A protein has these predicted regions:
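Short beta-strand scaffold segments in enzyme catalytic cores
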Residues: 23-31
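Secretory/periplasmic and organellar redox-cofactor proteins
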Residues: 9, 114, 124-144
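Short, basic/aromatic recognition patches
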Residues: 1-18
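Zn2+-dependent cytidine deaminase-like catalytic core
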Residues: 35-127
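Short secondary-structure junction motifs
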Residues: 18-22, 65-67
Length: 144
């Protein structure tokens, strides 16, 4: 498994350990992680603290995100895809899109290369979480 997807999975596990939704993300440039984050909607009571947004916040002001690659354990939603497009990130690796198809077509239509890794570990992590906490999941994707 890719070391950067492993790092994103580690972030997702941290989020779950904190009582949140197990989605993690890392931002990579020049072969090094420059930001990492996980979904903190539950922990922070903030509806927009998705994993990718937390990751970008933690990367901070890096000047230019071009050349950076975003890894996420789940296909980014429209909120996070908007940030990807806004900051000029041109490549996204998603752990899976079976649980949530996200905004793949939106990103691709804006010139972002999106690669779905079809990670069984990511799929199983989400299946288990959704079975245990359906109300949190449906709140997260706006389907309450």
């Amino acid at each position: 498994m890719d070391e950067f997807l492993k790092a994103a999975i580690s972030e997702a596990r941290q989020g779950k350990a904190e009582g949140g939704i197990p989605i993690g993300s890392v931002l990579v440039r020049d072969g090094a992680i420059i930001g990492k984050g996980h979904n903190k909607r539950v922990q922070d009571g903030d509806p927009v603290t998705h994993a990718e947004i937390d990751c970008l916040r933690n990367a901070g002001r890096v000047g230019n995100y071009r050349g950076a690659i975003l890894y996420s354990t789940l296909m980014p939603c429209y909120l996070c895809a908007g940030a990807v497009v806004q900051f000029g990130i041109k490549k996204v690796y998603a752990g899976e899109d079976e649980t949530f198809s996200g905004a793949k077509q939106f990103m691709e239509s804006h010139g972002v290369e999106v690669i779905d890794l079809q990670s069984e570990e990511c799929k199983q992590m989400m299946r288990t979480f959704i079975a245990d906490h359906p109300e949190l999941w449906f709140e997260d994707i706006g389907e309450l």
